[in-house]
Amino acid sequence: MRTFAIFLLIALGWLQYTLWFGKNGMSDYAQVSNDVALQEEVNQGLRNRNEQMFAEIDDLKKGSEAIEERARHELGMIKKGETFYRIIDENSEG
C-alpha cells in the first residue's frame, strides 16, 4: 500500500510538471495567447488600412474631386483659368 501511495505521488508530480512546463502546457498556452493578441492587433491595423484604400478607390471611381486633388498635389496641375500661388515660409527647412 505504501509503494502504491508513493507511485501515485510520483505520477501526480509528473502530471503537474507536464501540465505547467511540458509541451502544450500552461507556459506554451500563455505564449500562444500573447502571440494571438499581437497578431490580432496587426490584423486590425491592416483591416483599417484596407478600408481606407477601398474608400479611396471608390472615391477615384465615382468622383472627379479625388482625381483633381491628386492631379494638383502629385502632378502640380491646375485648371484652365486658375492661378497657382506657392507661398514658401522663410523659416521652414528643406
From Swiss-Prot:
Residue intervals annotated with topology Periplasmic: 22-94
Membrane disposition: Single-pass type II membrane protein
Superkingdom as given in the UniProt entry: Bacteria
Residue numbers on the Cytoplasmic membrane side: 1-3
Gene3D superfamilies: 1.20.5.400
Transmembrane annotation, as ranges: 4-21
Keywords associated with the record: Cell cycle, Cell division, Cell inner membrane, Cell membrane, Coiled coil, Membrane, Transmembrane, Transmembrane helix
A Pfam family matched in the record: DivIC
UniProt GO cellular component terms: cell division site; cell septum; plasma membrane
Coiled coil: 33-71
An annotated GO BP: FtsZ-dependent cytokinesis
Subunit record text: Part of a complex composed of FtsB, FtsL and FtsQ.
Homology family: Belongs to the FtsB family.
Primary role: Essential cell division protein. May link together the upstream cell division proteins, which are predominantly cytoplasmic, with the downstream cell division proteins, which are predominantly periplasmic.
PANTHER family noted in UniProt: CELL DIVISION PROTEIN FTSB (PTHR37485:SF1)
Full protein name: Cell division protein FtsB
Organism: Aliivibrio fischeri (strain ATCC 700601 / ES114) (Vibrio fischeri)
